[in-house]
Amino acid sequence: MIEIIPAIDIIDGKCVRLSQGDYDSKKVYNENPVEVAKEFEANGVRRLHVVDLDGAASHHVVNHRVLEQIATRTSLIVDFGGGVKSDEDLKIAFESGAQMVTGGSVAVKDPELFCHWLEVYGSEKIILGADVKEHKIAVNGWKDESACELFPFLEDYINKGIQKVICTDISCDGMLKGPSIDLYKEMLEKFPNLYLMASGGVSNVDDIIALNEAGVPGVIFGKALYEGHITLKDLRIFL
């Protein structure tokens, strides 16, 4: 069964969502992300994806206090991403209670450092973030496109020991128009042992069912929950 991973995106300490990574499209859903996390936990959710959008924009971890509060006031397994660009950022994330940390831009810009993290912390704790626009990897909070093609990028890191990947199709993210199932199928055909977490575009329970039927191991979503297109009760069949 597919793993359900709600997302909490944070700006100014608040729970927000963007559309296609556009910071100008910010919508605040809750002033208190800890309350959101506690509600998820009360409904059987075990895993949480926390994104520091301030961190992604400013190239260093910013909202670690929110992470710390979520980690201490719930028993959710938290993976954290956004602005993790240095050893110090990684240390802050783990010390603040993240069980796993996602690196995206750093894996493109400083592969030596990212591989060092993989060696030190292992593939259980380090997740590769592959944010994709037309099969190219995007960096810096999705503001810039790199020259990295998705499949060679993945193959390189899988050969170096990566096992967990969060793949976000930027064109779908926050648009509630359905996920890129064909892309994820293609990824799993090429890399059948990959623990792939699909992110972006989930609009209803049928999308999650379709991802599950496609063999996708995990799904990350937020806006569909916050907008009421999916209820926590709907998710019980997966939990």
From Swiss-Prot:
One of its GO terms (molecular function) is 1-(5-phosphoribosyl)-5-[(5-phosphoribosylamino)methylideneamino]imidazole-4-carboxamide isomerase activity. GO terms for cellular component: cytoplasm. Pathway: Amino-acid biosynthesis; L-histidine biosynthesis; L-histidine from 5-phospho-alpha-D-ribose 1-diphosphate: step 4/9. Disulfide bonds: none annotated. The gene is hisA. It is found in: Cytoplasm. Its main location: cytoplasm. The keyword Iron-sulfur does not apply. Its EC number is 5.3.1.16. Belongs to the HisA/HisF family. InterPro entries: Aldolase_TIM, His_biosynth, HisA_bact_arch, Isoase_HisA-like, Isoase_HisA-like_bact, RibuloseP-bd_barrel. The active site is at D9, D131. Keywords: Amino-acid biosynthesis, Cytoplasm, Histidine biosynthesis, Isomerase. SUPFAM superfamilies: Ribulose-phoshate binding barrel (SSF51366). It catalyses: 1-(5-phospho-beta-D-ribosyl)-5-[(5-phospho-beta-D-ribosylamino)methylideneamino]imidazole-4-carboxamide = 5-[(5-phospho-1-deoxy-D-ribulos-1-ylimino)methylamino]-1-(5-phospho-beta-D-ribosyl)imidazole-4-carboxamide. This is 1-(5-phosphoribosyl)-5-[(5-phosphoribosylamino)methylideneamino] imidazole-4-carboxamide isomerase. One of its GO terms (biological process) is L-histidine biosynthetic process.
